UniProtKB/Swiss-Prot annotation:
Keyword entries, A-Z: Ribonucleoprotein, Ribosomal protein, RNA-binding, rRNA-binding
Keyword set includes rRNA-binding: yes
Occurrences of domain S5 DRBM (ranges): 12-75
Coiled coil: none
Family: Belongs to the universal ribosomal protein uS5 family.
Function: With S4 and S12 plays an important role in translational accuracy.
Top-level taxon of the source organism: Bacteria
Protein name: Small ribosomal subunit protein uS5
Keyword Ribosomal protein tagged: yes
Lineage, top ranks: Bacteria, Pseudomonadati, Pseudomonadota, Alphaproteobacteria, Rickettsiales
UniProt free text on domains: The N-terminal domain interacts with the head of the 30S subunit; the C-terminal domain interacts with the body and contacts protein S4. The interaction surface between S4 and S5 is involved in control of translational fidelity.
GO molecular function, a single term: structural constituent of ribosome
Xref: InterPro entries: Ribosomal_Su5_D2-typ_SF, Ribosomal_uS5, Ribosomal_uS5_bac-type, Ribosomal_uS5_C, Ribosomal_uS5_N, Ribosomal_uS5_N_CS, Ribsml_uS5_D2-typ_fold_subgr
Amino acid sequence: MTIKNFQNNNDWSELLVSVRRVTTVTKGGRRFSFSILVVVGDEKGRVGCGMGKHAEVAEARIKAVNAAKKSMIRVYLREGRTLHHDIKAKFCSGEIVLRAARAGTGIIAGGAIRSVFEVLGIKDVVAKSTRSNNPHNVICAVFKAFDNMLSPRQVASKRGKKISEVVGNR
Protein backbone atom coordinates (compact mmCIF):
# COMPACT_ATOMS: atom_id res chain seq x y z
CA MET A 1 0.00 0.00 0.00
CA THR A 2 1.85 3.09 -1.25
CA ILE A 3 0.54 6.51 -0.35
CA LYS A 4 2.02 9.69 -1.81
CA ASN A 5 2.03 12.79 0.40
CA PHE A 6 2.78 16.28 -0.80
CA GLN A 7 3.93 18.33 2.19
CA ASN A 8 6.39 21.24 2.23
CA ASN A 9 6.98 20.77 -1.53
CA ASN A 10 8.46 17.33 -0.85
CA ASP A 11 7.19 14.20 -2.52
CA TRP A 12 7.13 11.54 0.22
CA SER A 13 6.16 7.99 -0.50
CA GLU A 14 4.78 5.99 2.44
CA LEU A 15 4.57 2.24 2.53
CA LEU A 16 2.73 0.37 5.25
CA VAL A 17 4.82 -2.68 6.15
CA SER A 18 2.86 -4.29 8.97
CA VAL A 19 -0.20 -3.76 11.16
CA ARG A 20 -0.48 -5.77 14.37
CA ARG A 21 -3.07 -5.82 17.10
CA VAL A 22 -1.25 -5.92 20.42
CA THR A 23 -2.62 -6.47 23.90
CA THR A 24 -1.75 -5.04 27.29
CA VAL A 25 -3.05 -7.15 30.16
CA THR A 26 -4.01 -5.12 33.22
CA LYS A 27 -5.80 -5.82 36.47
CA GLY A 28 -9.08 -4.75 34.86
CA GLY A 29 -8.68 -6.93 31.77
CA ARG A 30 -7.12 -6.62 28.34
CA ARG A 31 -6.47 -3.39 26.47
CA PHE A 32 -6.10 -3.68 22.72
CA SER A 33 -4.10 -1.31 20.54
CA PHE A 34 -2.52 -1.33 17.10
CA SER A 35 1.17 -1.29 16.26
CA ILE A 36 2.08 -0.11 12.77
CA LEU A 37 5.43 -0.22 10.97
CA VAL A 38 5.84 2.31 8.13
CA VAL A 39 8.65 3.09 5.69
CA VAL A 40 8.83 6.61 4.22
CA GLY A 41 11.08 7.80 1.40
CA ASP A 42 11.45 10.36 -1.38
CA GLU A 43 12.51 7.82 -4.06
CA LYS A 44 15.73 9.82 -4.52
CA GLY A 45 17.98 8.31 -1.84
CA ARG A 46 16.35 9.33 1.46
CA VAL A 47 14.47 6.82 3.61
CA GLY A 48 13.22 6.40 7.16
CA CYS A 49 11.22 3.88 9.16
CA GLY A 50 8.99 4.33 12.16
CA MET A 51 6.60 2.54 14.49
CA GLY A 52 3.43 3.92 15.97
CA LYS A 53 1.06 2.53 18.60
CA HIS A 54 -2.45 3.75 19.35
CA ALA A 55 -5.94 2.42 20.03
CA GLU A 56 -7.00 3.44 16.50
CA VAL A 57 -5.25 2.42 13.28
CA ALA A 58 -5.35 5.90 11.71
CA GLU A 59 -3.73 7.54 14.74
CA ALA A 60 -1.09 4.80 14.92
CA ARG A 61 -0.29 5.38 11.23
CA ILE A 62 0.14 9.13 11.79
CA LYS A 63 2.51 8.45 14.71
CA ALA A 64 4.48 5.95 12.62
CA VAL A 65 4.83 8.34 9.68
CA ASN A 66 6.03 11.15 11.96
CA ALA A 67 8.57 8.81 13.57
CA ALA A 68 9.76 7.69 10.12
CA LYS A 69 10.26 11.27 8.94
CA LYS A 70 12.32 12.01 12.05
CA SER A 71 14.57 9.00 11.43
CA MET A 72 15.35 9.80 7.77
CA ILE A 73 18.79 8.84 6.50
CA ARG A 74 20.59 9.50 3.22
CA VAL A 75 21.75 6.53 1.15
CA TYR A 76 24.23 7.18 -1.65
CA LEU A 77 23.21 5.33 -4.81
CA ARG A 78 25.34 4.37 -7.80
CA GLU A 79 23.91 5.89 -10.99
CA GLY A 80 20.72 6.58 -9.01
CA ARG A 81 19.60 2.96 -9.33
CA THR A 82 21.66 0.55 -7.17
CA LEU A 83 24.05 0.28 -4.22
CA HIS A 84 27.77 1.06 -4.42
CA HIS A 85 28.92 -2.23 -2.91
CA ASP A 86 27.66 -5.47 -1.37
CA ILE A 87 27.06 -5.47 2.37
CA LYS A 88 25.91 -7.77 5.18
CA ALA A 89 24.21 -6.71 8.41
CA LYS A 90 22.59 -8.24 11.47
CA PHE A 91 20.03 -6.86 13.91
CA CYS A 92 18.80 -9.12 16.73
CA SER A 93 17.98 -12.37 14.94
CA GLY A 94 17.57 -10.84 11.48
CA GLU A 95 20.45 -11.16 9.02
CA ILE A 96 20.47 -9.68 5.55
CA VAL A 97 22.75 -9.59 2.52
CA LEU A 98 22.42 -6.70 0.04
CA ARG A 99 24.12 -6.91 -3.36
CA ALA A 100 24.47 -4.35 -6.10
CA ALA A 101 23.01 -5.48 -9.42
CA ARG A 102 23.33 -4.69 -13.12
CA ALA A 103 20.87 -2.42 -14.89
CA GLY A 104 17.63 -4.20 -15.74
CA THR A 105 17.84 -6.72 -12.89
CA GLY A 106 15.02 -5.17 -10.86
CA ILE A 107 14.36 -5.52 -7.16
CA ILE A 108 14.93 -9.12 -6.17
CA ALA A 109 13.91 -9.08 -2.53
CA GLY A 110 11.05 -10.36 -0.47
CA GLY A 111 8.81 -9.11 2.26
CA ALA A 112 9.75 -6.03 4.19
CA ILE A 113 13.07 -5.46 2.42
CA ARG A 114 11.32 -4.79 -0.89
CA SER A 115 9.29 -1.97 0.64
CA VAL A 116 12.46 -0.17 1.80
CA PHE A 117 13.98 -0.34 -1.70
CA GLU A 118 10.77 0.87 -3.36
CA VAL A 119 10.50 4.06 -1.29
CA LEU A 120 14.28 4.60 -1.43
CA GLY A 121 14.29 4.68 -5.24
CA ILE A 122 16.55 1.69 -5.87
CA LYS A 123 15.77 0.01 -9.19
CA ASP A 124 18.31 -2.85 -9.29
CA VAL A 125 19.32 -4.84 -6.22
CA VAL A 126 19.47 -8.40 -4.95
CA ALA A 127 18.69 -8.94 -1.26
CA LYS A 128 18.41 -12.01 0.91
CA SER A 129 17.00 -12.22 4.41
CA THR A 130 18.08 -15.19 6.51
CA ARG A 131 17.15 -16.50 9.94
CA SER A 132 14.34 -14.07 10.81
CA ASN A 133 11.31 -12.96 8.84
CA ASN A 134 10.14 -10.52 11.51
CA PRO A 135 9.55 -7.26 9.56
CA HIS A 136 10.88 -5.02 12.34
CA ASN A 137 14.17 -6.93 12.73
CA VAL A 138 14.67 -7.20 8.98
CA ILE A 139 14.08 -3.48 8.36
CA CYS A 140 16.36 -2.52 11.26
CA ALA A 141 19.05 -4.76 9.75
CA VAL A 142 18.63 -2.98 6.39
CA PHE A 143 19.03 0.41 8.08
CA LYS A 144 22.09 -0.85 9.94
CA ALA A 145 23.55 -1.92 6.59
CA PHE A 146 22.83 1.53 5.15
CA ASP A 147 24.63 3.13 8.12
CA ASN A 148 27.70 0.94 7.50
CA MET A 149 27.70 1.62 3.75
CA LEU A 150 30.40 3.96 2.46
CA SER A 151 30.21 6.30 -0.52
CA PRO A 152 33.07 6.23 -3.07
CA ARG A 153 34.29 9.58 -1.69
CA GLN A 154 34.57 8.10 1.83
CA VAL A 155 36.38 4.99 0.55
CA ALA A 156 38.80 7.13 -1.48
CA SER A 157 39.63 9.38 1.48
CA LYS A 158 40.23 6.34 3.73
CA ARG A 159 42.59 4.76 1.20
CA GLY A 160 44.27 8.01 0.21
CA LYS A 161 43.32 7.63 -3.45
CA LYS A 162 41.27 9.49 -6.04
CA ILE A 163 37.60 8.66 -6.51
CA SER A 164 38.25 7.57 -10.11
CA GLU A 165 40.77 4.98 -8.86
CA VAL A 166 38.26 3.56 -6.37
CA VAL A 167 35.33 3.43 -8.78
CA GLY A 168 37.37 2.04 -11.68
CA ASN A 169 35.59 0.07 -14.39
CA ARG A 170 32.19 -0.83 -13.11
